[in-house]
Curated annotation (Swiss-Prot):
GO terms for cellular component: plasma membrane. It is found in: Cell membrane. It is a multi-pass membrane protein. This is Putative manganese efflux pump MntP. Its main location: membrane. It comes from Bifidobacterium adolescentis (strain ATCC 15703 / DSM 20083 / NCTC 11814 / E194a).
């Protein structure tokens, strides 16, 4: 289960990784403090939003346990498919983005990149896992990937943005399929 949570953490961090690469492309001089701010904003929100989804879904879990595997699969497949689709769309908003790292620039980005994580939290409510460990792993993973994304964007340009987003989406879809197939008895 720990590997599965780590894979989910890596997958949901791909949006922030891609945005961080975009920010890295626009920065003339990247400071360590900028990377730390980015890691804290993105990691914090990616940890908070699944927690919100988890507690909201836990309240209603007794009403949906008969179809929980379909909910998990549907949400993860939807998020993953959306990530793959977005990788192939032209993202003019990120191209115009300023390299600022203050709250006025980071808050909207952190919220926008973390909205999908609410659905991940909803799916967590139907899994047997430690929610606190899960959100800590997601937050740390996202923080590391977003800080790395800044540096990669600064050094290598936009070459890895699309493949990272596609990989993250595919992993989420595969985890959703795994949960579904386990429940249906296809996997032991």
């Amino acid at each position: 289960m720990l590997i599965q949570i780590l894979l989910i953490g890596v997958s949901v961090s791909m949006d922030t990784f891609a945005v961080s690469i975009g920010k890295g492309l626009t920065v003339k001089k990247l400071r360590g403090l900028d990377a730390l701010k980015t890691a804290l904003w993105f990691g914090g929100f990616q940890a908070l939003f699944p927690l919100l989804g988890y507690f909201a879904a836990s309240t209603f879990s007794k009403y949906v346990t008969a179809v929980d595997h379909w909910i998990i699969f549907g949400l993860l497949a939807l998020i993953g498919g959306n990530m793959v689709r977005e990788a192939f769309e032209e993202d003019e908003e990120n191209a115009k983005e300023t390299p600022e790292f203050d709250w006025k620039h980071m808050l909207p980005l952190a919220v926008a990149c973390s909205i999908d994580a609410v659905a991940v939290g909803v799916s967590f409510a139907f899994m047997t896992l430690n929610i606190w460990l899960s959100v800590v792993i997601i937050g740390i993973t996202t923080g590391l990937f977003s800080a790395a994304g800044l540096y990669i964007g600064r050094v290598f340009g936009s070459r890895w943005q699309k493949p990272a987003q596609i990989a993250g989406g595919v992993v989420l879809i595969l985890i959703g399929l795994k949960v579904l197939f386990e429940h249906l008895g296809f996997l032991g």
